[in-house]
Swiss-Prot record:
This is Ketoisovalerate oxidoreductase subunit VorA. It catalyses: 3-methyl-2-oxobutanoate + 2 oxidized [2Fe-2S]-[ferredoxin] + CoA = 2-methylpropanoyl-CoA + 2 reduced [2Fe-2S]-[ferredoxin] + CO2 + H(+). One of its GO terms (biological process) is sulfur compound biosynthetic process. The keyword Oxidoreductase applies. Keywords: Oxidoreductase. Its EC number is 1.2.7.7. GO terms for molecular function: 3-methyl-2-oxobutanoate dehydrogenase (ferredoxin) activity; thiamine pyrophosphate binding. InterPro entries: 2-oxoacid:Fd_oxidoreductase, Pyrv/ketoisovalerate_OxRed_cat, Pyrv_flavodox_OxRed_cen, THDP-binding, TPP_enzyme_TPP-bd.
Length: 477
C-alpha cells in the first residue's frame, strides 16, 4: 500500500539557513511567483533520478540569483548572462556533473543570448530552465526581450511598440534551428494540468543530463503577479490567453532515444605525457645545482615575430640547463605570426630563480629598432646592449651598446633568418652569460635535433658571430 507523503524534496533544504532573516522556511519570492513551483519540480526530479550529489546549479543575476539558498546541491552564482560559459566550463572539467542553468528572460534572452546560442550549437551537456515571465522581475518589471506586443511595463508605459522595440523573442523556435540540441520544449505553470506536463519535461531534461547525452532546453511560462499587477485569476488568464498565444506550449524536439551519450576524450596532464609531447628528455635537462658563486644574469631578447626571438631564448636556456644552472625562459608576444612584437626573458642563476620576468636586463639583444627604442632604458647599470646594426641605430646612453651586423653576417653565410644565431655567437664569444662555448654548440644541436643541415648551418653562423665579436668587440669590454 502506497503512502502519501507531503514534504519538500531532499534536493531542497528544509530550512533556508543561507537566506537568513526572520522566516527561514520561506523563500524570498513574491506570492504567486512561478519560481517556487519550478524549484519544487526540479527538486523532485533530482530526487527521482538520484542526481543530487552530481548536480551543480548555476544561477545568474535575476530573481533566481539566490537559488543557492534553496537547492541542496552544488551551486555557483555567475555574472549576468554568463551561465552558459560557466556551465560549459564545469561540464567539461567535471564530466560526470549534472549541470543545471536556471535563467530568466532578462538574462538568457538578452545579455546572455549569444552565449546561450553558442552553447546550444555546441551541444554542451547542460539542462537549461528558462523562466519566461515577460518582464525583468527583480528590478521592478521593465520590458524584457519576451515582453508581448502592447504589454505595459515600467519602461514601456504605453505598451511594447514593435516599431521601436521589435517583437517578443521566441527562444525555443530560435534554438530549434540548431542541429545539436537533444531536447527542446515549452511548458506553462498556468494550472495543475500544465504543471504536471511541465514536470515531465523537466524530468526528461535532467534524464538527458544524467545519461550525458547533450543539451536540453525547457522554456517555462511563469506568472509574475507583483510586477504585472495581477491577482491569481488574472495571472492564470494572462498565461493562458496571452502568453500561450504568443508562445505556443509544445514539444519542439526530443531526440533522447536515438542520441548516444556524449563521450569526450580525457585530458592527460601527466609529466610523462607532457615530456613526450614537448620532446623533453631527462638526460637533456639535468637537475640544477646550487652555486652561490655563479652570478645571476638576466637577458632580454626582443624583435619582430618571425625573427627567432623565442627560439634564441630557448637555445640560450638550454645551454644554461645543460650546465646545471637554475634557468627560466619567459616569452611575451602578440597575436601575429609574423611582424608583431616579440620578446622573451632568460634568467641564468646559481640559485633558485625568484621571478622569470626580466624587467631590468643585464643583457639586451635587440633585433630591430622598435625593440631597441622600447627596452634600452630598462637595461641595468653596468649592463650591455647588443643590437643589429643592419636594421637599427643607437644614439648612445648610460649603458654600453654594441652594434652587430647580425643580418648581414647571417645572409653572408646562407640565410637571413639566422641573425638570432649570430647574436648567440656574439654572446658566447664575449662570455656575457658565464656559460661554456661548448654548451652553446650543444644547445644548437638540441634545438634543431633531427635537422642535420640546419644544425650544420647554424653552427657555422654561430662561429661566424663569435669570430666577428672577437675581432671587433672583445677588446672593448
Amino acid at each position: 500500500m502506497t503512502k502519501k507523503v507531503i514534504r519538500k524534496p531532499d534536493s531542497l533544504h528544509d530550512v533556508f539557513e543561507r537566506k537568513g532573516g526572520s522566516a527561514p522556511t520561506a523563500t524570498h519570492y513574491c506570492a504567486g511567483c512561478g519560481h517556487g513551483i519550478l524549484h519544487k519540480l526540479i527538486g523532485e526530479a533530482m530526487d527521482e533520478l538520484g542526481i543530487q550529489e552530481r548536480a551543480v546549479m548555476i544561477s545568474p543575476v535575476g530573481c533566481a540569483v539566490f537559488a543557492y539558498y534553496y537547492f541542496d546541491c552544488g551551486n555557483v552564482q555567475v555574472a549576468h548572462g554568463r551561465a552558459p560559459a560557466v556551465g560549459t566550463g564545469i561540464s567539461r572539467a567535471e564530466d560526470d556533473a549534472v549541470v543545471i542553468l536556471y535563467q530568466g528572460d532578462g538574462d538568457l534572452a538578452s545579455i546572455g543570448l549569444n552565449e546561450t546560442i553558442q552553447a546550444a550549437n555546441r551541444g554542451e551537456k547542460l539542462a537549461v530552465f528558462f523562466v519566461n515571465n515577460t518582464v525583468y522581475g527583480m528590478t521592478g518589471g521593465q520590458m524584457a526581450p519576451t515582453t508581448l506586443v502592447g504589454e505595459v511595463t515600467v519602461t514601456c508605459p504605453t505598451g511594447r511598440d514593435p516599431r521601436y522595440a521589435g517583437y517578443p523573442l521566441h527562444m525555443c523556435e530560435l534554438l530549434d534551428n540548431l542541429q545539436a540540441p537533444v531536447f527542446i520544449e515549452r511548458v506553462s505553470l498556468a494550472d495543475p494540468k500544465r504543471i504536471r506536463r511541465a514536470r515531465r519535461a523537466i524530468k526528461r531534461a535532467l534524464e538527458i543530463q544524467r545519461d550525458g547525452k547533450g543539451y536540453a532546453f525547457v522554456e517555462v511560462l511563469s506568472p509574475c503577479p507583483t510586477n504585472l499587477r495581477q491577482d491569481a485569476e488574472g495571472a492564470e488568464r494572462f498565461l493562458k490567453e496571452e502568453m500561450e498565444k504568443e508562445f505556443p506550449v509544445k514539444n519542439f524536439r526530443d531526440r533522447s532515444a536515438e542520441t548516444e551519450p556524449l563521450i569526450r576524450s580525457e585530458s592527460d596532464f601527466s609529466r610523462e605525457s607532457l615530456d613526450r609531447i614537448f620532446q623533453i628528455r631527462e638526460d637533456s635537462v639535468p637537475d640544477p645545482v646550487d652555486d652561490p658563486e655563479f652570478p645571476e644574469v638576466r637577458v632580454k631578447i626582443a624583435g619582430f615575430g618571425g625573427q627567432g626571438v623565442l627560439s634564441m631564448g630557448l637555445t640560450l636556456a638550454q645551454a644554461a640547463c645543460s650546465e646545471g644552472r637554475h634557468t627560466s625562459w619567459y616569452p611575451a608576444y602578440g597575436p601575429e605570426q609574423r611582424g608583431g612584437t616579440s620578446s622573451c626573458g632568460v634568467v641564468i642563476s646559481g640559485e633558485r630563480v625568484g621571478s622569470p620576468a626580466v624587467d631590468t636586463p643585464d643583457v639586451l639583444v635587440a633585433l630591430n629598432q622598435p625593440s631597441l627604442d622600447e627596452f634600452a632604458d630598462d637595461v641595468a647599470d653596468g649592463g650591455i646592449i647588443l643590437y643589429d646594426s643592419t636594421t637599427a641605430s643607437f644614439s648612445g646612453g648610460a649603458v654600453r651598446a654594441m652594434g652587430v651586423p647580425a643580418l648581414e653576417i647571417a645572409r653572408k653565410h646562407g640565410t637571413a633568418r639566422a641573425a638570432n644565431t649570430v647574436m648567440l655567437g656574439v654572446m658566447m664569444a664575449l662570455g656575457l652569460t658565464g656559460l661554456d662555448e661548448e654548451s652553446f654548440r650543444e644547445a644548437i644541436k638540441f634545438t634543431f635535433a633531427g635537422k642535420e643541415k640546419i644544425i650544420d648551418m647554424n653552427l657555422r653562423i654561430l662561429e661566424a658571430g663569435a669570430e666577428w665579436a672577437r675581432e671587433n668587440i672583445e677588446g672593448e669590454l
